[in-house]
Amino acid sequence: MEKLTILLLVAAVLMSTHAMFQGGGEKSRKAINFSETRKLARNKQKRCDGWSTYCHDDSECCSETCANSYCTLIKGVRTTSHPI
């Protein structure tokens, strides 16, 4: 009778442990899907050009200022000379 009781206790512990890990696996899968979704969203964002890059329009530059066909270093600053 003691062996049966011990066997039932071990079975109960194993089943509860299995259920606990199964539930945690679902949460981690959701967390992974969430992080993948965020990463994909960041990759889809429009990239901007850095300072001294040739441009046609303000929206192409990170500083949002295209002056004399080059992106400026500081937002809103329009220089009259070409960058280095």
Curated annotation (Swiss-Prot):
Name of the protein: Conotoxin Am6.1
UniProt keyword list: Bromination, Cleavage on pair of basic residues, Disulfide bond, Gamma-carboxyglutamic acid, Ion channel impairing toxin, Knottin, Secreted, Signal, Toxin
Residue list for modification 4-carboxyglutamate: E60, E64
SS bond partners: C48-C62, C55-C66, C61-C71
Residue ranges annotated as propeptide in the record: 20-47, 78-84
Pfam families attached to this UniProt entry: Conotoxin
Location in the cell: Secreted
Entry's free-text remark on domains: The cysteine framework is VI/VII (C-C-CC-C-C). The presence of a 'disulfide through disulfide knot' structurally defines this protein as a knottin.
Top-level taxon of origin: Eukaryota
Molecular function GO labels: ion channel inhibitor activity; toxin activity
Signal peptide interval: 1-19
Family label: Belongs to the conotoxin O2 family.
Post-translational modification 6'-bromotryptophan, affected residues: W51
Species the sequence originates in: Conus amadis
Gene Ontology CC entries for this record: extracellular region
Location (main, coarse): secreted
Tissue occurrence: Expressed by the venom duct.
